[in-house]
Amino acid sequence: MDRHHHHHHHHHHHMMSGGGQDPAAGDGGAGGATQDSFFLGPAAAAMFSGAGSSSSGAGTSAGGGGGGPSPSSSSPSLSRYESQKRRDWNTFGQYLRNHRPPLSLSRCSGAHVLEFLKYMDQFGKTKVHTPVCPFYGHPNPPAPCPCPLRQAWGSLDALIGRLRAAYEENGGTPEMNPFGARAVRLYLREVRETQARARGISYEKKKRKKPSSAGAGAGPSSEGSPPPPGGSASGGGDTSASPQFIIP
């Protein structure tokens, strides 16, 4: 008994010496969470889901937290919009690093941004029917078809809004901003029209009719829902406003 007590005391002492470490361990736990979510950023999965599912992914994680404390405690300073913006910026940075021939941010043009958006399509989750498909123009196709999956227009629009802001936050000038290039705006408009026709949906109607319900209620279709409240002009600004509005 005595010996056991001694052993216990020793163990306790060890824990106390670790006691200085215990808060650190707790801290490490939170740090682990922070680091984990940071690690997720550049990691393939989060990147690949890109703009498309990340908006719904962010929705689920925030919703899953439910209480709010857990998501916010892991990253107290960053809103969902800010952390998504950082992830997108990392994704674009990685795209530049892997680019052949090498491409620096300063030499990046609207054409390169379009190249990046087309590259992101391979990680999209939105089926866009081709005109020869029997389901072309059907909002809810009754059966599977071989049409390609793409990034939804709303995802690309929000992605460009975030990257446009990140570019200027990282020292770029507005007049040099490749994400604000006319070619990019025209491309987004074209994608919106193409997808609206292919999927048999109208973005215009949605935009006016239910900005609030689309933001709050449309969980599964969150791919398309974040952008409608803001036009493509202020897509970035609005996406930043709406998630912060939803979380509290």
UniProtKB/Swiss-Prot annotation:
Region feature Disordered, mapped onto this chain: 1-35, 50-84, 198-248
Biased composition regions of type Gly residues, renumbered to the chain: 17-32, 60-69
Expressed in which tissues: Expressed in lemma, palea, rachis branches, flag leaves and young embryos. Highly expressed in lemmas and paleas of young spikelets. Expressed in stamens, pistil and leaf sheaths.
Effect noted on mutating G124Q: Loss of homodimerization
PROSITE patterns: ALOG (PS51697)
Subcellular location: Nucleus
Variant or mutagenesis effect after changing R80W: Loss of homodimerization
Alphabetized Pfam families for the sequence: ALOG_dom
Predominant subcellular localization, coarse grouping: nucleus
Compositional bias segments (type: Basic residues): 1-15
Biological process according to GO: mRNA transcription; negative regulation of DNA-templated transcription; post-embryonic plant morphogenesis; regulation of seed development; response to light stimulus
Disruption phenotype: Triangular hull with tortuous lemma and palea. Defects in development of lemma and palea, which have a beak-like form. Beak-shaped grains of decreased width, thickness and weight with a loosely interlocked lemma and palea that are unable to close tightly. Poor grain filling.
Extent of Low complexity compositional bias: 50-59, 70-79, 212-224, 239-248
Domain ALOG: 80-207
Effect noted on mutating H129Y: Triangular hull 1 phenotype; loss of homodimerization
Family, similarity comment: Belongs to the plant homeotic and developmental regulators ALOG protein family.
PANTHER family per UniProt: PROTEIN G1-LIKE2 (PTHR31165), PROTEIN LIGHT-DEPENDENT SHORT HYPOCOTYLS 3 (PTHR31165:SF95)
Subunit structure: Homodimer.
Function: Transcription factor required for lateral development of the lemma and palea. Involved in the regulation of grain hull development. Possesses transactivation activity in yeast, and may determine grain shape and size by modifying gene expression in the grain hull. Regulates the expression of cell proliferation and expansion related genes. Acts as a transcriptional repressor and regulates cell expansion during the lateral development of spikelet.
The name this protein goes by in its record: Protein G1-like6
Organism: Oryza sativa subsp. japonica (Rice)
